[in-house]
Amino acid sequence: GGIITDKEAVKLLKAGQSVLGIYPANIFEGFIGGEQYTFWNGVYFYLLPIIAVLPFGTSFFEDEDSGYLKNIYIKKKKEIYLVCKFIVTFISGGIAAGLPYIFSFMMNLLYVPAIKPNQLARHNFVNQLNNMSDWYYEKPFLYFGVYLLIIMLCGGVFATLSLCVSFAAKNSLFVMFFPFLFNISFDYVAMELKIEKYVPSNIMNPMMTEYIKGRSMFSVFTEIFAAILLCFGFFVVLNKKRERIV
């Protein structure tokens, strides 16, 4: 995340105005969540599942693989441990996923003015047909704040998704990369089925609203919370009743 943020900062030093040269760059159009003219935006959102897993995503597998989990179950109720593990993993994944976004925005504040985006400047591809385009041009702080919340919630989902496969994994690498592989596979299948509006990478990216055109924010948050409940139920209920399969 830090490397990506640094790359964005270097780019900002070289770009101080729009493509047409008639409107200055602003804090919302140069950071990693608000630009589309380099590949770093795509890199961040595709690597986000791995970033989210790094803090505690593999901790359940490691506790069980080392035998330490048995000692925990002796001292604490199994249900309490599983719920606490899920909550901690979810929160840590959300924070890890959102930090590059936040740091990039903060670094952007050092170089460019805090003015509202202008559609005629052609800094991005957000137009009046995209979701929340009125927020983007009139209330940009609110617009990117909502997307930060979406990013953190999705980061939590990716982190807890790694918990859901821990009981059947043979090594921690599979646990770490499973959310990434799942996201890539889902992206490919959704593209083939023409349902890109449900892909997490498109839902999280503030510059990809064209792919979720027609969806309300209520439906987006409903999808995210449904995924949270599904991961919670699968992880807690399954591990409450059985030990590792392999």
Where do the model's predicted regions map?
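Central hydrophobic cores of alpha-helical transmembrane segments
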Residues: S172-F186, N202-I203
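Residue-level recognition of pore/gate-forming positions within transmembrane alpha-helices
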Residues: T89, F180-I184, I228
